[in-house]
């Protein structure tokens, strides 16, 4: 009955789409997916180019994250590198040009381990596609950026951040000194990005583990310290932060009390941001 009412009353649909808690989900994913015709084509068993295409160019990964579903022994030989780039380029060539956000670069293996990552970024740009990349930033050193300046041409760069101190990050990634290395790389990146006047949208993704809902406030403090250490005229170098729960098969879900606490912490962060603190 409820679904029938919603289908037949546009005002209810407007409330859900424009004012509901899932507004971004509807407007950024569901509605564009429907408008693309992909769902109708699937039902009718007609071919259509995928609505979103993930490019996973990593050859290996230095992390063994506790919530990652990948095979920790997985890696690709360097001999397959050129063939892989050729396949990616063919895929980009075949893609319809009506959606500039069709592609993104990510992976169960770390994208920066591909020494030709710059070629992929440039090829997307050449074909008028936006390029966004997700990385753990362990390799995002000054030297790496010098060798791969194409990183600054990305439309969006999102770093997966795995802990608010060295102990927690090591527990998650199984990589010693990962917290120190990644934090240092982020600080250097924002400085270089500012100097090069790069327009890349930059931010972090953080996984909220069970019983770690207070980490959000500590995470914000870390970002504030990075901003202070960078000492740029631009006070805030971060354009966004995304949060998610541990959705791995054996991940421990947050209970209602922990969700309420996390919600309160998010509101606290909003207040700090509004006060420019």
Question: Where do the PLM segments sit?
Answer:
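Radical SAM enzyme [4Fe-4S]-AdoMet core and its adjacent flexible, acidic
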Residues: 1-14, 56, 77-78, 83-86, ...
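N-terminal [4Fe-4S]-dependent radical SAM core
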Residues: 2-54
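Canonical Radical SAM [4Fe-4S] cluster-binding loop centered on the CxxxCxxC motif
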Residues: 45-87
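A general structural motif
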Residues: 48-52, 98-102, 126-130, 151-156, ...
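Glycine-centered loop/turn positions within well-structured domains
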Residues: 63, 131, 164-167
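Residues lining the SAM
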Residues: 71, 106, 205
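Conserved Radical SAM active-site core
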Residues: 75-134, 138-151
């Amino acid at each position: 009955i409820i679904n029938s009412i919603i289908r037949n009353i546009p005002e209810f649909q407007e409330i859900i789409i424009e004012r509901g808690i899932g507004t971004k989900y509807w407007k950024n994913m569901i509605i564009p997916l429907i408008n693309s015709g992909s769902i109708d084509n699937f039902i009718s068993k007609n071919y259509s180019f995928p609505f979103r295409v993930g490019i996973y160019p990593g050859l290996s990964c230095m992390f063994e994250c506790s919530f990652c579903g990948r095979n920790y022994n997985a890696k690709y030989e360097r001999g397959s590198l050129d063939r892989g780039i050729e396949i990616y380029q063919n895929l980009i060539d075949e893609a319809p040009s009506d959606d500039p956000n069709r592609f993104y670069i990510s992976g169960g293996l770390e994208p920066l381990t591909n020494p030709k990552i710059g070629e992929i970024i440039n090829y997307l740009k050449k074909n008028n596609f936006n390029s966004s990349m997700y990385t753990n930033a362990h390799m995002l050193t000054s030297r790496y950026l010098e060798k791969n300046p194409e990183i600054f041409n990305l439309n969006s760069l999102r770093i997966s951040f795995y802990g608010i101190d060295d102990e927690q990050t090591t527990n998650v990634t199984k990589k010693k000194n990962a917290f120190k290395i990644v934090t240092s790389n982020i600080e250097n990146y924002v400085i270089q990005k500012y100097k090069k006047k790069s327009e890349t949208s930059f931010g972090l993704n953080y996984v909220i583990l069970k019983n770690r809902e207070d980490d959000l406030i500590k995470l914000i403090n870390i970002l504030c310290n990075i901003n202070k250490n960078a000492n740029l005229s631009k006070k805030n170098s971060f354009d966004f932060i995304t949060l998610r729960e541990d959705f791995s098969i054996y991940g421990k879900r947050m209970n209602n009390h922990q969700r309420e606490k996390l919600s309160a912490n998010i509101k606290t962060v909003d207040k700090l941001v509004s006060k420019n603190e």
